[in-house]
C-alpha cells in the first residue's frame, strides 16, 4: 500500500486528504475505501496505529471490490508530506561510505567507535514538508546541501525492542531529504555538539509511505535484521550526482530501532532516517579528486531523489 496526502489543484476548498496509489498515475481516495471507519479529521497516526483498518484496506485492494471504486489521476492533485503529524524525527548515521568520506573531508580518520553501536540525532519535526516548492531562508544559503536518505515510520508503541523484534515496529518507508547548511553546521560542530541550527530548518519527506509488505521482494535477511535492495539516486537540475543502494547500510533499521528504544518509548508516527547514503550529498562529493570546483545548492535548483521501489521525491528551492 502506498499512502499519500494531497490537495486538489485549482479548487477554493484546499482541504488535505489521504489517497492510496493504485498505479504510478492513478489513485483512490482514502475516504472512498473506508468512509465508515474514519472521521474527516483523521491523521496519519490514526491510520498507521490501527491494524484492523489496515487489514481491511489491504483486503479491498487485493479483491475485486477495488474495481468498483472510482480512480483519480495523481497528476491532477498536489502532493504533500504524507505525514500530517510527526511524533519525533530522528536521523541515524548508518552508511559507512558517507561517514568515512565526510570525515576525510575534515582531515579526520574513520572513527573506530562507528562499529560499536548506531548513533542518531534529533532533528526538527516541525520543519518537515513534502514534494514541491520549498522555501529556505537566505541565512542558510551558504554551502546549502541536500542529503539522500530513506526514512522508516514507526507503527506501534514499544520500549527495549530487540533487533529480532524490531521489524514488527516498522509501518512503512518513505524518501527523506535532510537539507543542511554546511557552513553553519561545521562552525557548530567545532564545539563537539550537534548538528543543531545547520540542520534545523528544512527536511522533506514523501511522496508516499510505502508499507513494508510492498517491499517483501527487496528484503535481504541477516542475523542483524533486514537489509533492503532498493536503488537510490539523486539529480540536481537533471544532472545525476548521487547513486547508492539501501542494502549498503552498515547498521540495519532493526539495529537502529533497538538502540533508540533502550529505555525510551517508541510511538506511532516516529520517523527515523537512515542517514545519508554513499555519495548522497555535495559535502561528500566535493571531496572527490574529480571535482575541481565545489558545488552547492542555489535558488531555483530542482532536487529529484529517485528510487526503484518507494517513488521519487522532487523539490524546487526558493530562497527567501
Give a label for each model feature.
Residues 1-34, 197, 203, 207-210, ...:
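Charged, cofactor-coupling segments
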Residues 1-119, 302:
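N-terminal non-catalytic cap/leader segment that marks the start of a structured domain
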Residues 38-44, 250-262:
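Short, surface-exposed linear segments at secondary-structure transitions and domain or protein termini
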Residues 51, 77, 146-148, 228-230, ...:
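Residues at beta-strand starts and edge strands
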Residues 72-73, 132-134, 286-288:
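Short gly/ser/thr-rich secondary-structure transition/capping motifs
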Residues 83-257, 294-295:
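Glycine-enriched loop-and-adjacent helix/strand subsegments that border the catalytic/binding cleft
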Residues 257-268, 279:
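Extended, compositionally biased non-globular segments
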Residues 268-269, 300:
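Loop/turn positions that initiate beta-strands
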Amino acid at each position: 500500500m502506498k499512502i499519500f496526502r494531497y490537495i486538489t489543484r485549482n479548487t477554493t476548498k484546499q482541504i488535505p486528504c489521504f489517497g492510496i496509489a493504485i498505479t504510478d498515475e492513478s489513485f483512490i481516495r482514502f475516504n472512498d475505501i473506508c468512509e465508515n471507519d474514519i472521521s474527516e479529521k483523521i491523521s496519519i497516526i490514526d491510520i498507521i496505529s490501527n491494524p484492523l483498518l489496515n487489514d481491511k484496506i489491504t483486503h479491498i485492494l487485493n479483491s475485486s471490490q477495488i474495481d468498483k471504486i472510482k480512480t483519480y489521476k495523481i497528476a491532477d492533485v498536489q502532493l504533500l508530506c504524507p505525514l500530517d503529524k510527526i511524533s519525533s524525527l530522528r536521523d541515524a548515521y548508518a552508511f559507512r561510505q558517507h561517514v568515512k568520506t565526510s570525515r576525510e573531508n575534515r582531515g579526520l580518520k574513520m572513527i573506530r567507535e562507528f562499529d560499536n553501536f548506531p548513533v542518531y540525532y534529533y532533528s526538527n519535526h516541525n520543519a518537515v514538508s513534502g514534494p514541491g516548492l520549498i522555501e529556505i531562508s537566505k541565512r542558510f544559503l551558504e554551502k546549502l546541501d541536500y542529503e539522500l536518505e530513506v526514512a522508516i515510520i514507526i507503527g506501534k508503541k514499544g520500549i527495549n525492542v530487540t533487533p529480532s523484534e524490531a521489524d514488527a515496529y516498522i509501518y512503512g518507508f518513505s524518501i527523506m531529504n535532510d537539507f543542511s547548511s554546511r557552513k553553519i553546521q561545521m562552525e557548530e560542530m567545532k564545539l563537539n555538539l550537534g548538528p543543531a541550527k545547520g540542520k534545523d530548518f528544512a527536511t522533506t519527506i514523501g511522496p508516499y509511505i510505502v508499507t513494508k509488505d510492498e517491499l517483501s521482494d527487496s528484503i535481504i535477511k541477516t542475523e542483524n535484521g533486514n537489509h533492503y535492495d532498493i536503488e537510490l539516486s539523486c539529480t540536481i537540475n537533471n544532472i545525476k550526482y548521487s547513486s547508492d543502494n539501501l542494502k549498503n547500510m552498515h547498521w540495519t533499521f532493526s539495529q537502529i530501532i533497538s538502540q533508540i528504544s533502550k529505555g525510551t518509548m517508541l510511538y506511532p508516527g516516529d520517523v527515523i532516517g537512515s542517514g545519508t547514503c554513499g555519495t548522497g550529498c555535495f559535502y561528500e562529493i566535493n571531496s572527490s579528486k574529480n571535482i575541481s570546483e565545489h558545488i552547492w545548492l542555489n535558488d531555483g535548483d530542482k532536487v529529484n531523489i529517485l528510487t526503484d521501489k518507494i517513488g521519487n521525491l522532487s523539490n524546487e528551492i526558493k530562497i527567501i
